[in-house]
Amino acid sequence: MGGELGDARLWAGELKSLHERFVHRFSRSEPRESALAYMQGLIAPLERKNGWTLAEEAGHGGPDRIHRLLNRIDWNADEVLDDVRDYVIEHLGDPEAVLIVDDTGFLKKGVRSAGVQRQYSGTAGRTENSQIGVFLAYAGGRGRTLIDRRLYLPTSWTDDRDRCRAAGIDDTVGFETKVVMAKAMVRRAITEKIPFRWVTADAAYGFSKGWRTELERADVFHVMATTRHDTVVTRWAMDHPVHDLFPGLPRQKWKRRSCGNGAHGPRVYDWARVEVRPWHREDRRHYVIARRSVRRPDEISYYIAYCPTETTLDELIRVAGARWAVEECFQTAKQECGLDDYQVRRYDGWHRHMTLAMAVHACLTVLRARELDTGKAETDPPSSYPSPCPNFDA
């Protein structure tokens, strides 16, 4: 999506069309107009995106209207997100889609922004003063985008109600782990009948046996990364370490496959699976999957899978590899849609900004999907499938 006149007109038309879906959520003309102007500013090629630059892009005399939109005017960001999600499903809905849970960090200064503290941020790769947001991504055959979000509040916040009130956090909002937030997002997707087939997440979420059990009881198929110390039920033990299932596996059981394209080409690993929990229903299977580095065979990652009996290893590899789609969403949303360009401190303000930035990213994804449909896109296809490949993992 370049800055040419045709692209600009295309963007303007699609953003306006998406905006019209939720314009009824605002009771006054000012926030209606400001929401559209805000989204247009987030996608504009501005060096910095803040209240002043977005106001200037919108032709406002100052940032007051932007600040009122994010901090003071009464509107429900969750209701707007419902409308954005409907837009995503209408244009990108896929019964074979994968729901992906992950979190990302937003580096901040000071101590007054809701949820901020010194905590590990994957964005920085170290402990930094930051906010952490938990997100749900939707990855289908035509594209991937973000469809849900929650700001993580550490106990340093939830145990201090005066501090919470100063940041606009209601007394009813208590501490929740990131896994609990993730579970709520997936439950909402199920309740709203969003079309999907799989759920996946990294080991920070997949290690939760409670969540895996909940998904299984709802008959939700999943491939969840876990740690080598996780345990499963086998014929030999009730708590069998997953890393102990593979050392004696015959060589022919390992398959070299790509789980998708990375920055340096196909991500190729050696893969194997072992069936566990053999006394379950006939039409379902449980597997532990191992992903071994080609260049460094001592580096092995593990996954727990719950799936239909006929599911192939290649399909499970595809789902495991789909997790990287959420990282692509974060990168694109931050670089092109202003996801991390905000100066709000209040809890509602964070969710409002994220909702409008996610709307812009959804619009971007839909437009690129249309280009793919007409053969005009210059980007890679939106989904990758495992295939035999001579390239090794980096």
Go through the PLM ranges and name each one.
Residues 208, 234-235, 353:
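Short Asp/Glu-rich motifs
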Residues 16, 125, 141-167, 171, ...:
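An anionic, glycine-rich sequence signature occurring as long contiguous blocks
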Residues 2-200, 204-221, 228-231:
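Conserved, well-structured functional cores that handle cations and Mg-NTP chemistry
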Residues 101, 105, 205, 311-344:
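Short amphipathic alpha-helical "interface-anchor" segments enriched in bulky aromatics
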Residues 132, 299, 325, 352-358:
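Catalytic-loop motifs flanking and including active-site residues across diverse enzymes
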Residues 24, 28-31, 48, 195, ...:
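Intrinsically disordered or highly flexible coil/loop and linker segments, enriched in small
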Residues 332, 337-394:
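Basic, amphipathic alpha-helical segments enriched in Lys/Arg and hydrophobic/aromatic residues
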